[in-house]
């Protein structure tokens, strides 16, 4: 298969995660495009270094944003699997030097979703007063025979900002197992949001730990999701307030329907008497009044439930 044909397959795959896949693949902006276990395209730009190589059955990628460079347009990483029974293993290192800023959009699309493993190990280093905005969009097809396991370690220097949004709300999930550890220095800001919509026998596991080690560091962790049918969602979210005036909040809102199960374990740890960490969780069925209002407009119960759930997780 030619490179052109492979890029066309990638375009078809990421239609599920982007409204303009052609612009991502053929545009002028920085990007890394991976299909199965092969790097199809790497494009850098002034102020940013993008490197990628295939080694020992893995994809190894590195992104370095040079000091002072602030990118107004997003950088794209595309990971596509268009075949069945494929393992895709990726090691990624992302470094933002002092006073730099980027928005990175990661498109992970596996439309056939059968016998697939997508394993990602990430290291992120955010320099002093740098800002990293990361948006990750997934589509896993309709079979559910898939394992996705991202493991990420983040270090944030003084005044650094880390914004992370993970979205998997269309199709099946299969098994999703997220592990993330974040260490924050003075005046760092962290904002993490996870959105999932689990159906049938899908399984979601999220384990996130944030250590506010610097004075005045701040963090919010948000989870928005729904567990339907026989699916299971397990959330273990932890914030440590280890320094004076550090502040953190955990906010979980999950809907359960059918024989599904949601477990939410917020953990707050305070090791300084000037720190403050809080949490709240709301888990339950769809609001009956909202349901009745929509059904009165002609929707059946399943249609009304889907609208309420997707409105809650921000997918409308």
From Swiss-Prot:
Transmembrane segment boundaries: none
InterPro entries, per the entry: Fe-S_cluster_assembly_SufBD, SUF_FeS_clus_asmbl_SufBD_core, SUF_FeS_clus_asmbl_SufBD_sf
One record GO biological process: iron-sulfur cluster assembly
One Pfam family in the UniProt entry: SUFBD_core
Family statement: Belongs to the iron-sulfur cluster assembly SufBD family.
Protein's UniProt name: Iron-sulfur cluster assembly SufBD family protein MJ0034
Species this protein is from: Methanocaldococcus jannaschii (strain ATCC 43067 / DSM 2661 / JAL-1 / JCM 10045 / NBRC 100440) (Methanococcus jannaschii)
């Amino acid at each position: 298969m030619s490179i052109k044909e492979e890029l066309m397959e990638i375009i078809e795959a990421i239609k599920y995660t982007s409204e303009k896949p052609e612009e991502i693949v053929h545009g002028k902006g920085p990007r890394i495009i991976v299909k199965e276990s092969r790097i199809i395209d790497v494009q850098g730009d002034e102020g940013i270094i993008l490197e990628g190589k295939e080694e020992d059955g893995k994809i190894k990628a590195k992104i370095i944003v040079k000091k002072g460079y602030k990118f107004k347009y997003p950088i794209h990483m595309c990971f596509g699997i268009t075949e069945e029974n494929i393992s895709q293993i990726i090691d990624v290192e992302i470094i933002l030097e002092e006073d730099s800023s980027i928005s990175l959009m990661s498109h992970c699309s596996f439309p056939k979703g059968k016998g697939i493993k997508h394993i990602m190990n990430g290291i992120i280093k955010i320099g002093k007063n740098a800002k990293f905005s990361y948006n990750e969009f997934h589509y896993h097809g309709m079979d559910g025979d898939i394992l996705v396991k991202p493991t990420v370690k983040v270090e944030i220097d003084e005044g650094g900002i880390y914004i992370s949004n993970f979205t998997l709300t269309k199709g099946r999930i299969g098994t999703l197992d997220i592990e993330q550890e974040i260490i924050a220095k003075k005046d760092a800001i962290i904002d993490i949001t996870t959105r999932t919509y689990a159906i049938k026998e899908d399984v979601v596991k999220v384990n996130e730990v944030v250590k506010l080690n610097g004075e005045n560091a701040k963090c919010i962790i948000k989870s928005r999701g729904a567990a339907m049918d026989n699916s299971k969602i397990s959330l273990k979210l932890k914030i440590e307030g280890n320094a004076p005036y550090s502040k953190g909040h955990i906010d979980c809102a999950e809907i359960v329907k059918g024989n599904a199960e949601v477990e939410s374990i917020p953990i707050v740890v305070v090791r300084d008497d000037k720190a403050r960490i809080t949490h709240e969780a709301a888990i339950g069925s769809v609001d009956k009044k909202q349901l009745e209002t929509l059904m009165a407009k002609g929707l059946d119960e399943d249609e009304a439930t889907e609208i309420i759930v997707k409105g809650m997780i921000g997918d409308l």
